[in-house]
Swiss-Prot record:
Origin species: Human cytomegalovirus (strain Merlin)
Chain segments carrying region Disordered: 23-43
Ig-like V-type domain ranges (all copies): 91-190
Membrane topology: Single-pass type I membrane protein
Residues in compartment: Virion surface: 24-293
Protein name: Viral Fc-gamma receptor-like protein UL119
Gene: UL119/UL118
Keyword Transmembrane helix: yes
Intravirion-side positions: 315-345
CC per GO annotation: membrane; virion membrane
Compartments in which it is found: Virion membrane
Segments crossing the lipid bilayer: 294-314
Role played: Serves as a receptor for the Fc part of human IgG. May thus be involved in interfering with host Ig-mediated immune responses.
UniProt keyword annotations, A-Z: Glycoprotein, Host-virus interaction, Immunoglobulin domain, Membrane, Modulation of host immunity by viral IgG Fc receptor-like protein, Signal, Transmembrane, Transmembrane helix, Viral immunoevasion, Virion
Signal peptide stretch: 1-23
């Protein structure tokens, strides 16, 4: 007991002799984000003996991007989309078909959604005109979209726009996003007329009118490189004759084709100075020029027939009259009768 009291007395004396001695307690904490914090603890005693406060904070922060890979993501299929526009001859309804063509395998791509946009100028924003999704959606646009999974075709229908319009459709599938752009030129195609010349040959006249639009970059229909082709199967048929005509007071460009067989619909491909129109299905109407000519030929044939009949009747009457005059002019020969014979008795 005496020894313990002696030790305590020695410690107290040493504290009074060295009041500037400092005692520090250091603790190091490592945070989960690699941040090291070093701090000291300050202790005050009733004898005014204080431990020096020494605080050192060392922070080491490391930043790294976090990448999350979904293990359920499917491999995207490589494919392209080709769109063709068509409209009825009366130019009221619009129909378009976008064909999905696979490049890397024979499986059909899983199209999740398709959104179509349109604009009438080349610099303005696109406006959504149609939407189709594999999930239920209430978004209705100006165009009706339906997808044929068997044929891998997107079918688009609606009212034909009143002016040339640029369309683009965005196809979203697993891991892929593809845009398909196509144009619908409304005004250049004035009319398409067809005439059946015989059982194996058909004459088609395509009438186009001048059209100015920003998509044409200032080009003209009368440019030497501007032309029209018709599709007959896999063949592109060039025009047989190109000329300028005036129809109903309008200046038009006429392209004449001769096709083998009889058609009610033709695939039209127009190119104006390097800018190609979307291939368009155009319904053929009977050629009014041919109908007018046919009517004129019919009337002319009828008149010729009537003239021939009249000439024939006139000839017959004249011949008969001439025969009558000849009968009158001929001298009448008296018939010599034999001398009466009387029998002698």
């Amino acid at each position: 007991m005496c020894s313990v009291l002696a030790i305590a007395l020695v410690v107290a004396l040493l504290g009074d002799m060295h009041p500037g001695v400092k005692s520090s307690t250091t603790s190091a904490v490592t945070s989960p984000s690699n941040t090291t914090v070093t701090s000291t603890t300050s202790i005050s005693t009733s004898n005014n003996v204080s431990s020096a406060v020494t605080t050192t904070v060392q922070t080491s922060t490391s930043s790294a991007s976090t990448s999350v890979i979904a293990t359920t993501q499917k491999e995207g299929h490589l494919y392209t989309v080709n769109c063709e526009a068509s409209y009825s001859y009366d130019q009221v309804s619009l129909n378009a078909t976008c064909k999905v063509i696979l490049l890397n395998n024979t499986k059909n791509p899983d199209i999740l959604s398709v959104t179509c946009y349109a604009r009438t100028d080349c610099k303005g924003p696109f406006t959504q005109v149609g939407y189709l999704s594999a999930f239920p959606s209430n978004d209705k646009g100006k165009l009706h979209l339906s997808y044929n999974a068997t044929a891998q075709e997107l079918l688009i229908s609606g009212l034909r726009p009143q002016e040339t319009t640029e369309y683009t459709c965005s196809f979203f599938s697993w891991g892929r996003h593809h845009n398909a752009t196509w144009d619908l030129f409304t005004y250049p195609i004035y009319a398409v007329y067809g005439t059946r010349l015989n059982a194996t040959t058909m004459r088609v006249r395509v009438l186009l009118q001048e059209h100015e639009h920003c998509l044409l970059n200032g080009s003209s229909l009368y440019h030497p490189n501007s032309t029209v082709h018709l599709h007959q199967g896999d063949q592109l048929i060039p025009p047989w004759n190109i000329s300028n005509v005036t129809y109903n007071g309008q200046r038009l460009r006429e392209f004449v084709f001769y096709l083998n067989g009889t058609y009610t619909v033709v695939r039209l491909h127009v190119q104006i100075a390097g800018r190609s129109f979307t291939t368009t299905y155009v319904f053929i109407k009977s050629d009014p020029l041919f109908e007018d000519r046919l009517l004129a030929y019919g009337v002319l044939a009828f008149l010729v027939f009537m003239v021939i009949i009249l000439l024939y009747v006139t000839y017959m009457l004249a011949r008969r009259r001439d025969w009558s005059y000849k009968r009158l002019e001929e001298p009448v020969e008296e018939k010599k009768h034999p001398v009466p014979y009387f029998k002698q008795w």
